Amino acid sequence: MPPASMRRDAIYAQFDTILVGRRTFEPMVRAGRATMPGMKTFVFSSTLRQQDYPDVTVVGENAEQTVAALRAASGKDIWLFGGGELFRRLLEAGLVDAMEVAIIPVLLGGGISLLPPPSKQTTLQLTGHRIYATGIAALEYTVST
């Protein structure tokens, strides 16, 4: 298995735009990683102010229209990197084509839902998978329409 840095670089190379919600973005800022190298960062929040975060684009309204415009523009794939509420909104608007889920072999007994309620049922089609020596299973799906 290639080193983690090589796998991470390969993942990052697919994308030129990253979308995050406020609750995902704030820990990124605290960790000194408000942006990802080579990617435009869009933060979806009704409370953050653009002038406080000049290195990213803060989207306060019209999330669906913003993402539709990003999808229509030329470029690489768009990465929704955390933000369950944002994921639900974009999924319900038909703006999610595919998703990748990593199953980590640790039972937490609680946590944040992948798709918070209320949400409609969505059918997925498995398109790929990888099993790592660590026990992590990476599953790739397309969203059925």
What is the predicted function of each stretch?
Residues 1-145:
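Enzymes that bind and transform nitrogen-containing heteroaromatic metabolites
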